C-alpha cells in the first residue's frame, strides 16, 4: 500500500514509486505538513519582513503557539498520531509506505522517543530519506531512521535555507 500526503510536493515525490509499483497512491490529509495559516507559502525573508513578531514567536518553538489560521505543534501532533492510528487500524499486518513531510516525521520521532513538543527538532530528516517504523504492542517503534543510501550516487545538493531545525 502506498499512502501520501495530499499536498503536491508529497504526491510528486510518490509518483515515481507509484509508477514503478503500478499503484495509485492513497491520499491522506492527516499526513500533511503542519498548517502555517497566514504564513503558508511564504519564504523566510518575506515572513521576516511582513510578520516579524509572528516570526519571533514561532521561533520560540512552544507546543501551544499557533500562527493565525494555522496549527500549534500540539494540534499538529494530535492530527499526525490520529492518522497513524487510523492507518494501522485499517491495514494491520500490512507493509505500508507513507510519503510525507519533515514536520510529520519530527512528530513521529518525538512520539516514539517520548520527547517534548517544545523545542528544536532533535533528529535528521533528509529529503527523500527512508525511515522505517513498525507498530507493535500498541505503539510505534523506529527500526531505522534517515537512511539516504539510495541517494549515494547522485551529485551533492546545495543546502536549503531553512531557519527552523
What residue ranges belong to the model's regions?
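Generic structural signal for well-ordered alpha-helical scaffold segments
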Residues: 77, 81-89, 109
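Generic beta-sheet signal
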Residues: 87, 94-103
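Short beta-strand scaffold positions
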Residues: 4-5, 78, 99-100
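Phosphate-coordination/substrate-recognition cap region in phosphate-metabolizing enzymes
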Residues: 1-56
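Amphipathic, non-transmembrane alpha-helical scaffold segments
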Residues: 7, 48, 73, 77-81
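Short glycine/proline- and acidic residue-enriched helix-loop micro-motifs
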Residues: 54-75
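Acidic, low-complexity terminal tails and accessory targeting/binding regions
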Residues: 23, 34-46, 89-94, 110-165
